[in-house]
Amino acid sequence: DWDDYVGRLAIGRLFNGRVRKGEEIAICRLDGAFAPAKVSVLYGYEGLRRIEVAEAGPGDIVAVAGLEEVQIGETLSDREDPRPLPPIHVDEPTITMVLSINDSPFSGREGRHVTSRKLKERLERERLVNVSIRVEPTESADAFRVSGRGELQLAILIEMMRREGYELSVGKPQAITRAQDGVVREPMEMLAIDCPEEFIGVVTQKMGERRGRMMKMSNHGSGRVRMEFRVPSRGLIGFRTEFLTDTRGTGIMNHLFDGWEPWQGDIEHRATGTLVADRQGRATAYSIENLQPRGALFLSPGDEVYEGMVIGEHARGNDLDVNVTKEKKLSNMRASGSDDMIRLIPPRLMNLEQALEFIRDDELVEVTPAAVRLRKRVLAANRRK
């Protein structure tokens, strides 16, 4: 953990002996080396509250300050008689995405932290607290590659940053691959699903589309069935929300990292293109009504748009630049009652997870405290063609 006043905290359970504030101890490194250290502050726990204590004994869960270089899995031991315990291993990250500053025309309107320096500080602070998160620089000083154990973990981090007042752009999540013996391998997950019997068909169909293989299925006659699948980590991107919708909120799913396997093949993404705003302004009901036959729209009348912003899903496979700010021309010719006949279909609203699954490599998710928007990586239409 991390504390703004005392720095990094090593949290663990005391197996034997006693530890006291100010005591000289040894850190047993994972490579077998020993490093001297001192307990500057010692904390215990009282329920969910962390309290400072003078000493602790066997079985106590404590947090030790003053150990800036300690890593998970290392042992804190007596300096005169160091005895390392078996190390704890943390699963390797399986999903990565690039987080960058928000450079859209709406940048700085809705957030308090908008610079790359603020973004880097926040990600570094998260790396100190969350041992399963990795933060790496990219070729751009304004972008950082963040890796974690899954799309949900990274989405939670982005949602936390959004609520803290950060503005950022997020690229498409990708699986981390590795080359072994000349073969590209990808991370696999063991997925356990518990759902009512009537949803077996839709769940197995969705798993098949995501390169999942059923390993086991059991039905104990209670009306619910348990299924186990082996599926690529990238196959689970966006699946949780889809699964809850398909099972009407009655399904339960959990997954664990289950090794590496050769690349399982391409997973079909959306076959449709997008509707892209070609100018800045406010969406009008007149334009939205005329664009409804072209596809599903993501916005309502009065919403602000900018050039390059994705405003809908095209019914065809290509991207289409459209003018959603066009207003109806006034004239002296009127048909009785015709001005009141605008019929609008409710917009399709997306949460952060759905947006991350929807985008392609040439698109980004713009995340601000007030909104989640989709946009093209290159905003100007003449530069995209």
Give the label of every model feature segment:
Residues I27-R29, S104-L128, M341, I345-P347:
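A short, contiguous, amphipathic alpha-helix enriched in charged residues
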Residues R8, S116-D142, E198-V202, R210, ...:
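Phosphate-interacting basic helix/loop segments used at nucleotide- and nucleic-acid interfaces
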Residues M190-K206, R210-R213, R226-D340:
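Contiguous effector/interaction surfaces
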Residues T138-Q153:
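Short glycine/threonine-rich beta-strand-turn micro-motifs
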Residues G22, G59, G73, L99, ...:
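Residue-level signature of catalytic and energy-coupling elements of molecular machines
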Residues D1-M97, S107-R109, T272, R279-S331, ...:
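Conserved nucleotide-binding/hydrolysis modules and their immediate coupling elements
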Residues D31-L42, V53-G57, P84-N102, N130-D142, ...:
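Interdomain boundary/hinge elements
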Residues A371-R373, L379-K385:
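Acidic, low-complexity intrinsically disordered tails
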